[in-house]
Each structure stands twice: as structure tokens, then as C-alpha cells.
Amino acid sequence: MKTLRHLSVLLLLLAVGGVCMACYSSKDLKAHGKRVTVTRDVGYFSKVDASGSVDIEFVQGKEQAMRIVGSKQLVDNIVVEKKGETLYVSHKSNSVISFFDDDVTLYIYSPDLTEVNLRGSCTFDVKGALDTDNLKVSVMGSGEADFDSIVCDAINFEVRGSGDIGAKRIDTKNAVANVFGSGDLDFDFLKADNVQFTVSGSGDLDAMLSQVKTMQLNVVGSGDMDIKAQNCGVANCTSAGSGSITLSGTMRDVVKNVTGSGDIDTSNLRAVLK
């Protein structure tokens, strides 16, 4: 019996040791040591493509520049490449970033920004005003993109997964925004001629719309859409599934199309302008 007990203990120790060796062989990177700042010359870019768990802050400026701030080990693990007008940001292969320590922040500057693609858990924060022709933003995974102020001709925002896109103010002509999955889209104030919003899945879209002439609002699945309107035109609303569309404020007319157990709520429309 004593021999059997000793054998069991030995097997347990070997198993634990194997797990520990596996953990240490996975290149788990943790922040330690003093923080460093590294400046890189990246040349002109107007598009950003990021993957992994990097935090990025963007400021529109006259010239392009980049600096990376974090612990030396994590900063050295960041890979930055430019192909054409696209700036690619990622981690070195087979490395795992620890979320329990300081992370890495990239501060980038460029006179133009027309496209942002995020994959993984990256964050992209645009500080101050952004003035551009067209802006396309895609978040795949659990990442997040935030904007202070956007002035442009057209926007196209898309969330796939559980990520988020938010904007405090947008002035544009045409706005397209889609949520596929459980993510969120939030527009504190959006002024446009035409908007087309779709929620497919269990996600949410909240927007304050001003002086929008035509609105195409679609919910497919169990998601929710909350629209507050200021002096808007016609809203064509479709709910297919168990989701809901809630409208409040002032608009000229509403066209409803409900398929399933969903709902299009117009009880909080204070007035319908004719």
C-alpha cells in the first residue's frame, strides 16, 4: 500500500511538472522592468490593420509618426510593417501577452485615415477631430474603436463578434453600420442625409440621429436598436425574429415590417413632422 501511495505521488508530480514545462514553453510575455519609448519611422499611411491585444491611439496631424510605449520586452515583441498605404501592427509569432501586467500603447499620427481593421482584442482610440473623405472601420473579435469627432462624406462601420464601435459626433452624408453577433455600436450624435443600420444576432445599436432624410433600420435575430431622432425624414423599419426597434423624437413618417415575435416601438415619438 505504501509503495502504491508513493507511486501515485510520483505520477502526480510528473504530471504537474509536464504542465509547468508546457506553460513555460509557450513564450508567455509579461511586462517587467522599466517602461521604454521607441520611435519608428513608418512613412505615409492612411489605413491601419491591427491584430492581437495592442492599444492604439491615433491623432490626425500634418505628418506621420509613431512611438511605442511599454516595458522593453513587450515593446520588442510588437511587429510594425507598412505595405502600400496600410500600417500593419501585430505580435511576433507564437507569443502570448499577459493581461495581468502593463500593456503596450502605440501612438500614431497621420494626415489621413480612411480605414481601420481590428482583429482580436485590440483597441483603437482616435483623439480629437478626424476630417477625411470616406472612413471604413471593421472590428472582428472583442476589440474596440472609439472616435471623438468625425467629418467625412461616408462612413461604413462593422462589428463582427463581441466588439464595440463608438463615436461622440459624426457629420457625414451617408452612414452604413452593421452589427453581426453580440457586439455594440453607439453614436452619441450623427448628422447625415441617409443611414442604413443592421443588427444581425444579439447585438445592440444606439444612435442619436439629426436631420436624416432616409433611414433603413433592420434587426434580424434577438438584437436591439434604439434610435433617437431630431427632425428626421422617413424610417423604413424591419424586425425579423425576436429583436426590437425603438424610435423616439421627431420624424416625418415610419414604415413598419415585423416578422416573428419582435417589436417596432414608436410610442415615444413626441411628434411626427409633416
Question: Which positions does each model-derived feature cover?
Answer:
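Acidic (Asp/Glu) and glycine-rich low-complexity loops/linkers
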Residues: 2-9, 18-140, 146-158, 166-176, ...
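Conserved G/P- and acidic residue-centered "switch" motifs that form tight phosphate/ATP-binding loops
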Residues: 141, 161, 181
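Short, surface-exposed interaction patches in beta-rich subdomains
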Residues: 167-274
